[in-house]
Amino acid sequence: MEQKHRSEFPEKELWDLTALYQDREDFLRAIEKAREDINQFSRDYKGNLHTFEDFEKAFAELEQIYIQMSHIGNYAFMPQTTDYSNDEFANIAQAGMEFETDASVALTFFDDALVVADEEVLDRLGELPHLTAAIRQAKIKKAHYLGADVEKALTNLGEVFYSPQDIYTKMRAGDFEMADFEAHGKTYKNSFVTYENFYQNHEDAEVREKSFRSFSEGLRKHQNTAAAAYLAQVKSEKLLADMKGYDSVFEYLLAEQEVDRVMFDRQIDLIMKDFAPVAQRYLKHVAKVNGLEKMTFADWKLDLDSALNPEVTIDDAYDLVMKSVEPLGQEYCQEVARYQEERWVDFAANSGKDSGGYAADPYRVHPYVLMSWTGRLSDVYTLIHEIGHSGQFIFSDNHQSYFNAHMSTYYVEAPSTFNELLLSDYLENQSNDPRQKRFALAHRLTDTYFHNFITHLLEAAFQRKVYTLIEEGETFGASKLNSIMKEVLTDFWGDAIEIDDDAALTWMRQAHYYMGLYSYTYSAGLVISTAGYLHLKNSETGAEDWLNLLKSGGSKTPLESAMIIGADISTDKPLRDTIQFLSDTVDQIIAYSAELGE
């Protein structure tokens, strides 16, 4: 499957960024305007921030600057992710990065003044509804503040600290070349995107196996570079943790999420211990239904019933999304309708494109979504997932100040995975045929929970071991990372999957390792979304409560936000309820198979 150039795709499959800026020149003018506003803000407030009134007035003006920075930062980032080979996009990204660094440095005086402000001033500011999140974060930073000169120096080094992720992202987009492979006498093209989105769950065993070996060999060629980039990332995080006086790099990385180490460890430990047997039971059933004597790592994404895995058009996908989110009501649905009408999504699976998917949030413009469309049902899950993220952006942006709009990383994946559950629910209820119902439940497992409760959770278990190494003063290279990943995979899958040296390269497949302790939050968010989904099914106020959670943005802590839908995440009950829900789902799938005589 050879990738086309971006120019070969129809306009309707490309996003329209003109809601942000008309063109590059318009973007550059916006940068100059923002620079002028920042300079004026500095002249007005540098050295003049002392009282509650000083800060209240400054926050009002700073919000307008941050909104400009939100628009500039998103526009700078997005075009390049559609084609890393495009020089103009690279220039836009560079201009945006330089501006962001300059702006951050110029505005450090405000953060410095805020964190050294009297507690009484911070307490009064924290009572203002539009500043609750900003003041909570300021108080966290206050406890680990290094002084104006050091903090400014660290801000100046922002681009340097970002370099490991930049290296990895560009390597994955431009350097990972997968060799052609042959299956049944036919030659197939392979790439990072086509393997991840198409071949890894192909119905043909030889195609799965050969594509996985081609894919793994392509990764292996770059394992030493990837390991070096990752080592630089975790060493810089450990350095910052030590400088700021945190007890560990874990405490440092969890601080901004407003959760503690106990919640982090519980998420990993309970899933590794209690969900692993559920996942193993399901995969052994998949192997049985598909007539496999053993299941290798090339097979674990195999659909339970590949004959029911239809090709889906983009129009079909939008129709499925609209029908799936109907339970949330008109207020939500009218926003979702705009995605197709106004081209908020970039679907083109062109060469040079970032292989992942994401949702961008230029504050109070409208969100954008990037993905690569291959026509599989899994793409519909990706689309509704990213619409979940960006739908939350719409509701929080419209109901919260800029300072309160952003959810804690801990549960930022809840809105996205909640939408996936709505899609599976819709698919399950479209037929009384046990095969169709089994198909829907299997996709609930594989497209939602396996990705978030397994793929990303195993990343988190891997990360925990890596950061522990660094905490103990050790280092690592590619061979050590391969060994750790192989150990984690084996611990989770037991005898359900054969784990080999190619599977050990899995750590090279995700950019999440460059985002702190982000990977585990997929499963944490899914616990909250599962609680929200069950609340929707069992309560008359379920839809309203969920929308209220979306509207709350970052105005509340993770524990407070989860309580909006009745989930107490200070305990292990929501996580155990989720695991039981999944165990029941596997039981129902096996029962449907028995009904079908399989």
What kind of feature is each model-predicted range?
Residues 407-436, 445-447, 451, 525:
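Post-HExxH zinc-binding segment in Zn-dependent metallohydrolases
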Residues 309-314, 362-384:
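Short pre-active-site segment immediately N-terminal to the catalytic Zn-binding motif
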Residues 307-312, 345-365:
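Catalytic zinc-binding patch centered on the HExxH motif and its immediate surroundings
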Residues 8-11, 22, 110, 114-115, ...:
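C-terminal, non-catalytic "cap/extension" segments appended to globular domains
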Residues 323-334, 360, 389, 393-401, ...:
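Conserved helix-loop functional segments at active or binding sites
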Residues 1-306, 318, 592-598:
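A well-structured
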Residues 288-327, 333, 392, 439-441, ...:
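Long, K/E/R/D-enriched contiguous segments that form extended
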Residues 245, 374-394, 416, 421, ...:
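Active-site recognition of the HExxH zinc-binding catalytic motif
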